[in-house]
Curated annotation (Swiss-Prot):
GO terms for cellular component: cytosol. This is DNA mismatch repair protein MutS. SUPFAM superfamilies: DNA repair protein MutS, domain I, DNA repair protein MutS, domain II, DNA repair protein MutS, domain III, P-loop containing nucleoside triphosphate hydrolases. SMART domains: MUTSac, MUTSd. It comes from Shewanella piezotolerans (strain WP3 / JCM 13877). Keywords: ATP-binding, DNA damage, DNA repair, DNA-binding, Nucleotide-binding. ATP binds at residues 618-625. The keyword Nucleotide-binding applies.
C-alpha cells in the first residue's frame, strides 16, 4: 500500500499530481479517491484492492508515460467494501470532492475527510454488535510494558502497567485489540508477530511530556492525579500515542473520551494466556464462539450487556464486596421475578452506549436519534419496575440510569417518527419544529397546486388537448405537447426539447416558478442540515449522563441475565469465604452439561489447608480434564457474581487460575509441543501462590518415560511443598499416587470405568483413592484402531508387565518406572465388579441413581 514518491510530479497529469500528493500523506492506507459516482484506486492500491475485494483491475490511460493501474467501486456501495477491508484489518483514507466542478480550474479540490481503521470504527455497519472493538497502544520500557486500550465506540479508556512478557501476552489475549500501535524500538516482536492490525509508530509519539500534555488537553484538567494514574509512566506514554492517533484519524472533537482508568492486576484474578485459551471463556479451541462459557451464560437482551458480560468473564474480581452486591441483586431479581419484566424493557433500549459515542463524534445518523428517543421513552417504565426493589445495588443502578425528560421532549419535537438513513436528502426534521423551515417546505410543496392550475389554464387558452406540465432533473419544468398539435403552440412558448412523439416548451412564468421552487427546496434542505447540526449541540451537554445511563443499563442487563441462568439452569449462589479453599458439592461443568446427550454426573471437590493437592487418576476419556475444568469455571463464575452449577459451593480467596491442559506445536515460534508444555509449567511454578488454583494435566508426556515421570513428580512435589497452591494434578503415571504417603495435604481421587469383554463403560464419578488401571487399549479400540494392532499391543503389554514384575521383585519392591496394567484372564460379571468397587456412603442420591442406571445398562 505504499504510495509512489511524488518526485518529478510535473511529468504527471494535474489530476494524478493531486492524487499522488494525497497518497503521500497516507502511505500505509488504501486511498479511496472520489471521481463522480465512483471511488477510484490507482497503482499499488488498485492491485491490492482488486485482490482483496474481487473488483476488476483495469488501466486508465497514461501518466508520466506509464499506464495507470486502476480499480473502482460505486460510492453508494462503499460501506459494504469497507466492512470487508476492516475484517482484513486494512485501513482506508476516504477522499471526497469538496470543490465546485463548475467553478474549478483544473482538478476539483479534494481532501481526505474520513479515515477508517480497524481500531477506530464507530459505524454500526462495520462493527461486531456483541464484541468490543479496541484500539491499543504498547510501549516498552526498562521496567516493563505500558499498555493502553480505547473503545472509541464507547469512550472506555484503560491503561495498565505490565511487569513481564507473560503478563503482556495475557493482556493482549484478554483485550484482543482490532488494531495495535507499537513503538519503532519494540523488541519483543514475537509476541505480536501473529496479530493483524499492528501499526508501527515513531518513537517521538511516545514522548512522556508530549503524551501527558495531550491527555491533559483531552480531559481539560491541570493534572492527572484525579484519575488515580500517578506513577503509571509507561502506560501514559502508550495512552498519549493512542490519543494522538485517534485525533489524526477522527479529525473531530472527542468529548465522549472524558476519563481514563488504571487497571491493576491485583484487582482481579490473574488468568494467563494459556488459561484463557484452555477454559474456552469466549473463544473455543478451534477459534469459534460455540460451546464456550459465554455461549452458555449469555442470554443478555442488549448488545452492550453482552459486551460487558464478556469483559467480566475475562476479569473475574477479587473484591468480595462488589461480588456480594451482584449476588444480592440477582437474589432480589429472582425473588421478585422482576428480571423478566426488566428484560422486556431493556430489550427495546438498543445500543445506547454506541449511539452516544456517535453523537459525540457528530457522525450519528437520523435513526440513531430515533433509537435514542425510543430508549429515553422507556425509562419511566423501567424505573417503575426498579422502584419496587429495596436492594441497595439495584437502587444505585436505578439512580444512575435516571430519566431524561427534556432530551426526550426535544427529540420527539425534532425528529420524524421514521427518519431516513441519511440527512443528505432531508426529511428528518419534523414539521412544526422550526417555523422558517415550515415556510420553505410549504412553498416547495405548494408547487403541485400551482402546476395543476397552470396546466388547466394553458389547455383552455391554447385549445391543445394533449398539453401537460412535467418535470425532470435534467431540463427542469416544461410544457409537453404532442407532435400532431404542435402547430397550435403560441409564439410565447420556447422549445426546450424535441422527442419522437412530443415537443417540450418553457414559458417565462413557468421558468420563474421553477427558480422559486428550486430555491425553496435548496433553502429548506440547507436549513434542515443546520438544524440537524444544532441538534448535536443540544444533546451533547448530557453526554456524560447518557454514558453513565448506558453503562448502568448494561450492568442491569447482565444481572437479569444471571438471574435467568440461575433459574433455568439450576445454579446455586456460592458462598464467599475469607478462609483459603474451595468446597463444591455436586458440581457440574456449565458447558458440557448443556451439550451432553446423557445426564451429566455431578462431582464434588474439597481443597483446603489440610487438603491442598488432589492427584487425579483414571482412564482416558474418563472425565479427568472435564472435572478439573469445571472446578476452574465454577471458581471463575463465583468471582464475577454469577451463580454456579452446583448444589452448594464455598469459595475462598483466589488470586490466580493456572491451567496446563493439552498443548500443540507453536510452529511460528519454533517450539515443540513439549517445549510449550514446559514453558507453561515454568510459568506456573514461578508465579503460583497458596491462593492460586492450579490445574495440571498429564505433565511430562512429550518426552521419555523416565524424564516425564521425573518432571511430573518434581513439579507436583514443588507445588505441594514449596508453593502450597490449591492443585488438581491429573496423571497417568501411577507412581504419583504414592505422593500422599510422602507429603501431607496431598490426596488421591480417581474416576473409574467398568470393562466387560471388549466394551468399557465410563462411570464419570469422582471417588477417593487412586485408580487401578488406565484402560488405554480399550479406549484405543473405541477410537477404531485396527484389531490386529490392539492384539499386538496386548501381547507387548503382557511382555512388559512380566519384565517389570521380575525387575520389581529383584529390587525388593522398589518403585517400577512403567505403569502396571493387568488384564484379568477370566472376566467376572461387570455388575459384580462395579458393586465391589462401590462405596454407597460416598454417593449422593443423584449419583446413586445414575450408578443404578449404569448397572442396569451393563446387565443387558
Amino acid at each position: 500500500m505504499t504510495a509512489i514518491e511524488p518526485q518529478n510530479l510535473e511529468k504527471h497529469t494535474p489530476m494524478m499530481r493531486q492524487y499522488l500528493t494525497l497518497k503521500a500523506q497516507h502511505p500505509d492506507m488504501l486511498l479511496f479517491y472520489r471521481m463522480g459516482d465512483f471511488y477510484e484506486l490507482f497503482y499499488e492500491d488498485a492491485k491490492l484492492a482488486s485482490e482483496l475485494l474481487g473488483i476488476s483491475l483495469t488501466a486508465r490511460g497514461k501518466s508520466g508515460g506509464d499506464p495507470i493501474p486502476m480499480a473502482g467501486l460505486p460510492y453508494h456501495a462503499v460501506e459494504g467494501y469497507l466492512a470487508k477491508l476492516v475484517q482484513l484489518r486494512v485501513s482506508v483514507a476516504i477522499c471526497e470532492q469538496i470543490g465546485d466542478p463548475a467553478t474549478s480550474k483544473g482538478p476539483v479540490e479534494r481532501k481526505v475527510v474520513r479515515i477508517v481503521t480497524p481500531g477506530t470504527l464507530t459505524d454500526e455497519a462495520l462493527l461486531q454488535e456483541r464484541q468490543d472493538n479496541l484500539l491499543a497502544a504498547l510501549y516498552q520500557g526498562k521496567s516493563g510494558y505500558g499498555y493502553a486500550t480505547l473503545d472509541i465506540a464507547s469512550g472506555r479508556f484503560v491503561i495498565t502497567e505490565l511487569a513481564n512478557t507473560e503478563a503482556l501476552e495475557a493482556e493482549l489475549q484478554r483485550t484482543n485489540p482490532a488494531e495495535l500501535l507499537y513503538s519503532e524500538d519494540f523488541s519483543q516482536m514475537s509476541l505480536i508477530a501473529g496479530m493483524n492490525g499492528t501499526r508501527r509508530r515513531p518513537e517521538w509519539e511516545f514522548d512522556f511530556d508530549t503524551c501527558q500534555r495531550l491527555l491533559l488537553n483531552q480531559f481539560g484538567t491541570k493534572d492527572l492525579n484525579g484519575f488515580g494514574i500517578e506513577g503509571a509512566r509507561l502506560s501514559l506514554q502508550a495512552a498519549g500515542c493512542l490519543m494522538q492517533y485517534v485525533k489524526d484519524t477522527q479529525r473531530t472533537a472527542l468529548p465522549h473520551i472524558n476519563s481514563i482508568v488504571r487497571f491493576n492486576q491485583t484487582d482481579s484474578i490473574v488468568l494467563d494466556a494459556a488459561t484463557r485459551r484452555n477454559l474456552e471463556l469466549t473463544v473455543n479451541l478451534q477459534g469459534g464462539h460455540t460451546n464456550t462459557l459465554a455461549s452458555v451464560l449469555d442470554s443478555t437482551v442488549t448488545a452492550m450487556g453482552s459486551r460487558m458480560l464478556q469483559r467480566w468473564l475475562h476479569q473475574p474480581l477479587r473484591d468480595h464486596q462488589v461480588i456480594k452486591a451482584r449476588q444480592s441483586s440477582i437474589a432480589e431479581l429472582i425473588a421478585t421475578e422482576n428480571y423478566q419484566l426488566l428484560a422486556e424493557d431493556l430489550k427495546a433500549l438498543g445500543d445506547v452506549e454506541r449511539i452516544t459515542a456517535r453523537i459525540a463524534l457528530r457522525n450519528a445518523r437520523p435513526r440513531d436519534f430515533a433509537r435514542l428517543r425510543q430508549a429515553l421513552g422507556l425509562l419511566p417504565q423501567l424505573q417503575q419496575t426498579l422502584k419496587a426493589s429495596s436492594e441497595p445495588h439495584l437502587q444505585y443502578l436505578s439512580q444512575v440510569i435516571g430519566e431524561f425528560p427534556e432530551e426526550l421532549a426535544l427529540l420527539s419535537r425534532a425528529v420524524v417518527d421514521n427518519p431516513p438513513m441519511l440527512i443528505r436528502d432531508g426529511g428528518v426534521i419534523r414539521d412544526g419544529y422550526d417555523a422558517e423551515l415550515d415556510e420553505w417546505r410549504v412553498l416547495s410543496a405548494g408547487a403541485t397546486d400551482y402546476l395543476t392550475q397552470l396546466e388547466a389554464r394553458e389547455k383552455e387558452q391554447t385549445g391543445i388537448s394533449t398539453l401537460k406540465v412535467g418535470y425532470n432533473r435534467v431540463h427542469g419544468y416544461y410544457i409537453e405537447v404532442s407532435r400532431r398539435e404542435s402547430d397550435l403552440v403560441p409564439l410565447s412558448y420556447q422549445r426546450r426539447q424535441t422527442l419522437k412523439n412530443t415537443e417540450r416548451y418553457i414559458i417565462a412564468e413557468l421558468k420563474e416558478h421553477e427558480e422559486k421552487v428550486l430555491s425553496s427546496q435548496g433553502k429548506a434542505l440547507a436549513l434542515e442540515k443546520q438544524l440537524w447540526e444544532e441538534l448535536f449541540d443540544l444533546i451533547l451537554p448530557k453526554l456524560h449522563e447518557l454514558q453513565e445511563f448506558a453503562t448502568a443499563a448494561a450492568e442491569l442487563d447482565v444481572l437479569c441475565n444471571f438471574a435467568e441462568c440461575a433459574e433455568t439452569l439450576n445454579y446455586a449462589c456460592p458462598e464467599l469465604s475469607d478462609a483459603s479453599g474451595i468446597h463444591v458439592e455436586a458440581g457440574r461443568h456449565p458447558v458440557v452439561e448443556q451439550v451432553s446427550q446423557s445426564p451429566f454426573i455431578a462431582n464434588p471437590v474439597t481443597l483446603n489447608s489440610q487438603r491442598k493437592m488432589l492427584i487425579v487418576t483414571g482412564p482416558n476419556m474418563g472425565g479427568k480434564s472435564t472435572y478439573m475444568r469445571q472446578i476452574a469455571l465454577i471458581t471463575l463464575m463465583a468471582h464475577i457474581g454469577c451463580y454456579v452449577p452446583a448444589e452448594h459451593a464455598v469459595i475462598g480467596p483466589v488470586d490466580r487460575i493456572f491451567t496446563r491442559i493439552g498443548a500443540s506445536d507453536d510452529l511460528a515460534s519454533g517450539r515443540s509441543t513439549f517445549m510449550v508444555e514446559m514453558t507453561e509449567t515454568a510459568n506456573i511454578l514461578h508465579n503460583a501462590t497458596p491462593n492460586s488454583l492450579v490445574l495440571m494435566d498429564e505433565i511430562g508426556r512429550g518426552t521419555s518415560t523416565y524424564d516425564g515421570l521425573s518432571l511430573a513428580w518434581s513439579a507436583a512435589e514443588y507445588l505441594a511443598n514449596n508453593l502450597n497452591a490449591m492443585t488438581l494434578f491429573a496423571t497417568h503415571y501411577f507412581e504419583l499416587t504414592q505422593l500422599p504417603e510422602q507429603i501431607k495435604n496431598v490426596e488421591n481421587v480417581h474416576l473409574d470405568a467398568v470393562e466387560h469383554g471388549d466394551s468399557i463403560v465410563f462411570m464419570h464419578a469422582v471417588q477417593e483413592g487412586p485408580a487401578s488401571r488406565s484402560y488405554g487399549l480399550q479406549v484405543a479400540a473405541l477410537a477404531g484402531v485396527p484389531n490386529s494392532v490392539i492384539c499386538a499391543a496386548k501381547q507387548k503389554l503382557h511382555h512388559l508387565e512380566s519384565r517389570d514384575h521380575a525387575l520389581e521383585q529383584s529390587k525388593n519392591g522398589e518403585m517400577a518406572v512403567q505403569q502396571t496394567i493387568s488384564f484379568p484372564t477370566q472376566p467376572t460379571s461387570p455388575v459384580i465388579e462395579a458393586l465391589e468397587k462401590l462405596n454407597p456412603d460416598e454417593l449422593t442420591p443423584r449419583q446413586a441413581l445414575d450408578y443404578l442406571y449404569n448397572l442396569k445398562k451393563m446387565a443387558r
